[in-house]
């Protein structure tokens, strides 16, 4: 479960400065109701508090803080949008693996090329904290995440997107990526 709040501190090109990016801060509350069950072994996944002993994961909830800079470059042969930011988090795999005791400062960003006014191609990168230590073939050190996506804006309300996401090393380390498609309708 996620609850997000974002505030734009500075608009792009503010103060008539064409080089100035937009700056946005965010607070992101996260809750993973399955962590306590996994850690206790009640679902048969990992027993005996292994998440706590492997990575110091004690919590099923946490709060992330973000700062992002975004800049559109419309005068290139095709318009390009660049987003670069930092995330302060206690989350392991964005909270999917629970929450550790200490914050880590992680980099993330994406680049979108607008092939047409309605079609965009994007790549994204998310650095991941290295909370888990490698234990033979059972647990591997976490790897960074990346995605490749294509999105088509059908109209001002509907967007269709498809892509591939690679999630580094996860505990099962056999299914580290996934193809996906989304339909987004905004009122």
Question: Where do the protein language model's features map onto the residues?
Answer:
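Outer-membrane beta-barrel proteins
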Residues: 34-38, 91-95, 130-135, 169-174
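Outer-membrane beta-barrel strand-turn architecture
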Residues: 9-13, 19, 73-77, 113-119, ...
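Outer-membrane pore/translocation modules
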Residues: 1-103
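Transmembrane beta-barrel strands of outer-membrane/channel proteins
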Residues: 23-29, 82-88, 109, 123-127, ...
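Outer-membrane beta-barrel "beta-signal"
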Residues: 3, 152, 158, 174-187
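Glycine/small-residue-rich hydrophobic helix-like segments
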Residues: 110-159
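Hydrophobic, lipid-facing positions within transmembrane beta-strands of outer-membrane proteins
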Residues: 1-7, 63-67, 105-109, 119, ...
